[in-house]
Amino acid sequence: SPIPFLRIIIWTTLVTLLSAITPVLLGVTSLQHSADSYIGWALHQGGDIYTNFFGSEGLLYYLLQFIVKGSIVFAAFYWLALLGSGIFLFRAATAISKRDKQVHQLLIGFYLLAGGLSFGGGYATILALPFLFYGLDLALAYMVDSNNDKGFLRIGMSMALAFFLAPLPTALYS
């Protein structure tokens, strides 16, 4: 079935507004979000990751924090990550289930969980999800059609990118 781009864009925008922008505007950010914003600022002040301050996320995540300087511009990357996650999750789900209703319910459940779990923090995991779901999509495409074996290198590259964004969740769920 065709990818419901409009539905994915609407859910992505709602989740981004509720979990990434609203906490900043209302001043109810979590400790994780405050620490991530601080890291973006500290890197610009000459701080070193893992030496001058504690960090448990991946190097690419901290590079992104350095680029956006811990600002609200980060919400644009968060939005893109949720958009990619929704698209690749939909593609992976339709590869193993031909029931459109259940696939759409899975998509709604994903966005509700992503919004609830990342309210004010946990952004590195959300940024890693498109790469994890892309790898899942490629692996499921191979399982459905074993003649389609072009993608193992892409699976490895996507898992590596996910690992450099959020090492612990990637190691646990890949």
List each language-model region with its residue ranges.
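Loop-to-helix entry region of an early transmembrane alpha helix in multi-pass inner-membrane enzymes
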Residues: 55, 59, 69-87
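Transmembrane-helix signature of polytopic, membrane-embedded enzymes
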Residues: 86-116, 130, 149
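Membrane-interface alpha helices of multi-pass inner-membrane proteins
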Residues: 151-169, 173
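Extracytoplasmic catalytic/substrate-binding loops of multi-pass membrane glycan-assembly enzymes
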Residues: 24-39, 49-64
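Membrane-interface transmembrane helices that cradle and orient dolichyl/undecaprenyl
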Residues: 132-155
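Start-transfer (signal-anchor) and selected internal transmembrane alpha helices
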Residues: 1-21
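Juxtamembrane segments of multi-pass membrane glycosylation machinery
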Residues: 45-47, 51, 63-77, 97-98
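Multi-pass, polyprenyl lipid-linked donor-dependent membrane glycosyltransferases
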Residues: 77-84, 116-135, 139, 165, ...
